[in-house]
């Protein structure tokens, strides 16, 4: 399966043509440049090789996510294709989480230290987005609970009484 960008296959773009426009506006090199620029601004250039990113189509309503164990930023291609102007703010938001975790240890996720990094980067320190997520939520599948053989027997015995 050919990859157009980290985490994105040709087949995914065929199924979601709006993502092709996002990838044209935000190629991997541009995202890496933005990430490196903010790390330089924060004076943590030593983390440029530690922090990586990719598109992650399993995200539904989250614009992005920071994975601490892997020092990885995951970006939602479907949501950000609708709002390409939000790629940079989301990238910086998630990068700030990774930097805070690496340099300061466990902290309040959107606490004072994280807000400081966001302010230095010139981005909003708002923790959540209000982007249109219509059609992106998973459809809930209602499943009937299977009853074990024992519970069926108990029900049958109760009916006999």
Where are these regions (language model features)?
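Active-site-proximal or metal-binding-adjacent scaffold patches in catalytic folds
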Residues: 1-89, 98-161
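Walker B catalytic acidic pair
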Residues: 94
